[in-house]
Amino acid sequence: ERVKVIVDIPKPDAEQTSVRMEREDGMLVCTGTAGVGNHERSALQTQDLRSCEPKELRILNKLYPGMSLGQYEVFVSADKQIQRFDAGLISDPLECYKDSSLFGGILPAPCTVIEYLWGYPIQAIAPYIEESVGLFGAIEIAFQNGPFFLNQNYQLQSEVICVGQSPQTEYIWYKTIALDASERQIASMIMQGRTMKASSKAYQ
């Protein structure tokens, strides 16, 4: 379905503003924040992410706050992003997603950041989910000492923030950070992953 993103005009001295996504019929899809500088008051940073008791869960009961989801030495290639760009598969394509001369390197589209900062730790989560149907929940991408240039090596580190459940899903919140060769934190992602209870053998 076609959607549009609406960004509130920030006050002159503001570092953050509200954003939302709506369908063409006006139905609200999601809300969040966008900002520069300190992001401690972002939409996700201010969520109450206290964990439930893992023993209350049936699917994610072996995951717990602080549990490592692995460290990964990764070369973040621009090849797939350039292919998507050329095929017209990137919404709102920017030249810096392909042209390295603008900022001294190729910058990632949001989908490329997620491809890496989600794509590796999900390998550690997948054995617990097994054949259950997974859904993306909330996502926050932040750049601390960017840019997060492509065609470079990074170390990704990921760990569980908390686990919990709703009537229809079990969910995990986790954080992944990307460090450059000098061990500076360049980027981070907070992700909520949901698993449908009805799709799991643990609920049958």
Task: Describe the function of each predicted region.
Residues E1-Y64, N145-Q204:
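HotDog/MaoC-like acyl-thioester-processing domains
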Residues A34-E140, S200-Q204:
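Hot-dog-fold acyl-thioester-processing enzymes
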